[in-house]
Regions:
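ATP/Mg2+-dependent ligation/transfer catalytic cores
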Residues: 1-131
């Protein structure tokens, strides 16, 4: 049997020809610009940007399979404290998908790519969270 591996982007319906072309454009630009780091960011419930920094050589992997993170990073207040007690029984009813500090996947949007002029050899991408 020959099984085709399905990427996370494909599973989420986020692998159109247009997105694939954008991904290739970003990967080429990142390589040509000598970027070493890429900040993958998302917006929290307060409108603040939070993020993780990846080595740019792994960016193709992030575009295809996303980046995992613990869901409690989305449940912080403005002083960076986790607001919900995710290990208590009733949180499953209040916040489905967050119980037990489950994982969330972040999928970068290639259309948001920027090279940061104030951070040497660093790119930036906005990500969409997927539960």
């Amino acid at each position: 049997m020959n099984f085709k591996r399905i990427s996370f982007a494909e599973q989420c319906g986020q692998n159109s020809a247009q997105r694939q072309a954008e991904v290739q454009r970003v990967l080429s630009l990142a390589q040509a610009s000598g970027l070493e780091w890429t900040r993958l960011v998302w917006c929290d419930v307060h409108g603040s940007l939070r993020g993780k920094t990846w080595v740019t050589s792994e960016l193709a992997s992030a575009f295809a399979d996303g980046m995992g993170m613990v869901s409690t990073l989305m449940l912080k207040d403005t002083s960076d404290r986790t607001v919900y007690k995710v290990f208590e029984a009733d949180v499953k009813n209040e916040l489905p998908g967050f119980e037990g500090a489950s994982n969330v996947m972040l999928l970068p949007d290639p259309a948001t790519f920027k090279i940061l002029p104030w951070a040497e050899k660093t790119g930036w991408l906005l990500c969409q969270p997927w539960f």
